[in-house]
């Protein structure tokens, strides 16, 4: 692998945009990430890399976008809203969920609350639910915390997707406010799936011990 020796941000972005192989693309992404470039062109190039046909490139781009946050958040939200590519949207949700920025709340809540058309979308919903948990434990805004708990409570009690209910239980455990604990107790009382019920029970027990 040829080491990139560019120091100019435009050169790094150009290298990524012109990458002819996954190896070249990953090297360029790593260079942008290491340089901590947060210029619009760099962020745009990283978001475009999420659509690369090689999964390792998209994964590297997600990691870079998370590292360069919060500067990347608005661009990620805009890209999500303007895209109809479910694959691209899934990677964007991964990034936003890991970042856990308040500004992504509406997008993550929307994803959690949409109907499942296939297994892939179901997985994205679970990632979004974990993102709401991240926001719930990092934000200083009581209203945002309340809305996160509301959406996670819905996700815990309503959907047929057991994986989403499981993810909601983990997120509510992390938030651990009285409201979140009450939601977990309700979930424990009504959950029929053994795996999910066990996870909710663990969440309730851990919260009681704190």
Question: What is the meaning of each model-derived region?
Answer:
Residues 144-195:
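Ankyrin-repeat and related helical/solenoid repeat scaffolds used for protein-protein interactions
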């Amino acid at each position: 692998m040829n080491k990139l020796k560019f120091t100019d941000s435009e050169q790094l972005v150009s290298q990524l945009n012109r990458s002819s192989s996954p190896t070249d693309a990953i090297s360029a992404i790593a260079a942008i990430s290491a340089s901590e470039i947060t210029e619009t062109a760099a962020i745009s190039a990283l978001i475009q890399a999420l659509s690369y046909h090689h999964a390792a490139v998209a994964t590297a781009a997600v990691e870079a976008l998370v590292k360069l946050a919060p500067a990347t958040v608005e661009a990620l939200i805009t890209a999500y809203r303007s895209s109809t590519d479910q694959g691209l949207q899934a990677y964007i949700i991964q990034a936003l969920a890991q970042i856990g920025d308040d500004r992504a709340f509406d997008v993550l809540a929307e994803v959690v609350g949409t109907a499942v058309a296939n297994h892939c979308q179901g997985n994205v919903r679970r990632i979004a639910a974990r993102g709401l948990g991240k926001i719930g434990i990092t934000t200083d805004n009581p209203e945002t915390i309340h809305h996160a708990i509301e959406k996670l409570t819905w996700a815990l009690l309503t959907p047929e997707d057991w994986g989403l209910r499981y993810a909601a239980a983990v997120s509510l455990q992390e938030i651990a406010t009285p409201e979140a604990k009450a939601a977990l107790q309700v979930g424990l009382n009504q959950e029929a799936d053994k795996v999910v019920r066990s996870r909710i029970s663990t969440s309730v027990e851990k919260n009681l011990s704190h």
